Amino acid sequence: GEMARFITKEPDTAEILSDLTAKNAFVTRLPGGGYRFHHMMKACAQRDFDALPPQEQATYQARYGHWYAENGQYLQALAAYSKAGRWDDALEVVQQDAGILLAALRPQQVLELLDRCGDQVLMEHPTALLVLMRRMFTWGQIPRMQQLKALLLESVRNHPDMTPRQRGNLLGECDLIESFLHYNDITEMSRLHRSASRQMTDQAVSIQSRGSWTFGSPSVLMMFHRTPGQLSRELAEMDDCMPHYYKITGGHGMGAQRIMEGEAALAQGRLNDAAIALERARAAISGSGQENMALCCDFLEMRLHMAAGEAVGVDLRRRRQLLQQHNAMWLHIFDSTAAYCQAVLGRADDIPELFREHRLDTVNFLGPCLPMMQMIENQVYLAQGAYARVIGGSEGLLALCRGMHYALVELYVLVQTAAAYEKLGKRREAAELLRQAAALAQPDGLVTPLAENGRYLRELLPEYGTLGREAAELSRVLENGSRAARQQEQRPAAFAPLTEREWAVAQRMARRLSNREIAGQLFLTEGTVKQYINQIYSKLHLTGDARTKRRRLEELMGE
């Protein structure tokens, strides 16, 4: 009602809505106070709206934009202001969002927005230019990023009325954004961070602490381990540079250096040191509301449990909490960490749907996290036995990793591809790839990346010296976690006819979960769950009403 009152300026919207929705099969009242309209009704309403004079349409769209912006729904606000041709307002929304929700759009949508705004309007919004520069970097649109920088500098020159403080903040923040052109070269990035810090008296506007720090990557170490043999130096550089970055961004990415330290310790098999660094990271980010860093901590913690021989599950309560925040990136990070861990444990059915069904192409991942996502998908392919798919995609993925100086991700992909060749009986190819992987891992003693796929490579690993033997030993510990996971799901003989998916549904039915809860845990729709339940009853020859069949299924499970 509140939104309708604001958009229409009608005082009696409550009565109008009541009349429109009472006993109307085309409208459903939602628990939160909103409404769901049948697509036919929406089409009719849209047709009537399109018949209004253009100026009247623009007035309503501008009101939509204002309402959405005031309620933090920046993407909807941006769309509405664009339809109204209100480019100044659209750029104000870009500034307010600080590029956080903007990341969910396709790059082409934002490029079209820039073209429609025009340079003169853009130069009146220098802070929005900073936000757009950073987003262009994450989309790999570097020439456009440089064009926006030129507009920013021209804007500063054309506004002699700016105070020295305003000018310093804009130029300093420009240095901060330009540092991303040296992404994952910690020394060069820090040089520009220090330059920004010298010029800025206020905190950055284009980077907010509530936004993503890892661009969607679940790991800090995968982003910043650049050169084999230089891990200790990279950790020291990160320790040195982050305080300067925190100063000008209000603590954006707080705890990143501790997470990287913990991930490095885990990669080297120093589990106690990794656990200490993890707790320090959690203490650093406590109360900051930085979900990105908390999710990276979760990933480190799950892999620590696995390295200790424990099975880890998918924390669906945590996922529901993230879902309520309406930030797709947090969900994708969560799904990627769950996918990787469940794949390493060999629990293919528990892998989130985005990765299990290989739908990564439906998501607009930011460029810096794409190699990590594809590496995790590789791990899923291994768990599913799709070894040829791993091999087929490895050449392009390795080239991408090398081009971005992602030494750790490259190491993982080499090991995965070696595992795929070994499973297909191609020992010579597997040994050559494992030799390349060992050459990357040896200088820094990175044992865990080899161990996490050790169950595929156990016969080969001992041939690679102390590192290989340690990896083989750790892989046996990891196998305990896989064994524990399998024991948790050991299937009685009566359920032998069921597929893995049907068995997963049947287990949850026996635990008296509702269809909605089963759907949530297995990343299915309720309709699909009902189909599986009918198939289960048919295969197990269970008859009677729904309650009788469910009780009989529980009895079979007990037997």
Language-model segments: residues:
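C-terminal boundary/linker of central alpha/beta nucleotide-binding cores
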Residues: 1-50, 59-62
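Alpha-solenoid helical repeat architecture
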Residues: 74-76, 86-87, 125, 162-172, ...
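Internal alpha-solenoid helical repeat scaffolds
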Residues: 121-297
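Linker/hinge segments immediately adjacent to helix-turn-helix/homeobox DNA-binding domains
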Residues: 374-396, 400-409, 414-427, 431-500, ...
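Recognition helix of helix-turn-helix DNA-binding domains
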Residues: 512-551
